[in-house]
UniProtKB/Swiss-Prot annotation:
<dbReference type="GO" id="GO:0030435">
    <property type="term" value="P:sporulation resulting in formation of a cellular spore"/>
</dbReference>
<comment type="similarity">
    <text>To B.subtilis CotY.</text>
</comment>
<dbReference type="Pfam" id="PF10612">
    <property type="entry name" value="Spore-coat_CotZ"/>
</dbReference>
<keyword id="KW-0749">Sporulation</keyword>
<keyword id="KW-1015">Disulfide bond</keyword>
<comment type="subunit">
    <text>Disulfide cross-linked either to itself or to CotY.</text>
</comment>
<dbReference type="InterPro" id="IPR019593">
    <property type="entry name" value="Spore_coat_protein_Z/Y"/>
</dbReference>
<protein>
    <recommendedName>
        <fullName>Spore coat protein Z</fullName>
    </recommendedName>
</protein>
Amino acid sequence: MSQKTSSCVREAVENIEDLQNAVEEDCPTGCHSKLLSVSHSLGDTVPFAIFTSKSTPLVAFGNVGELDNGPCFNTVFFRVERVHGSCATLSLLIAFDEHKHILDFTDKDTVCEVFRLEKTNYCIEVDLDCFCAINCLNPRLINRTHHH
């Protein structure tokens, strides 16, 4: 009898969740390295993007219809909130350029224009087995205010 093994994307997201929880309770940007450190004051978020088998980043939408305060936006950046089996709840991170303009990833903007990411209350449920790659980003992008 063969047992399905965990995917590397799922393992990475579970590791990110553990790292975030450890910081909340108490480098190179690989998804299994110590991205968050209490001594470095990097906060409680490891931002990341995940990709399909066609190397396409997952794009999600927040505040559709603008029923809440703030603009409608799309993003390719996420924070893991909870992993449950092969599924995960991811919160959307809204991306801004250095002029505080919201970036649109369905348009001409590229990820290289990202200056700052902010946490939101908008979430998406994903099946982690549907993704083939994960790109962890520097936690210093969260709420960044100036160039280093």
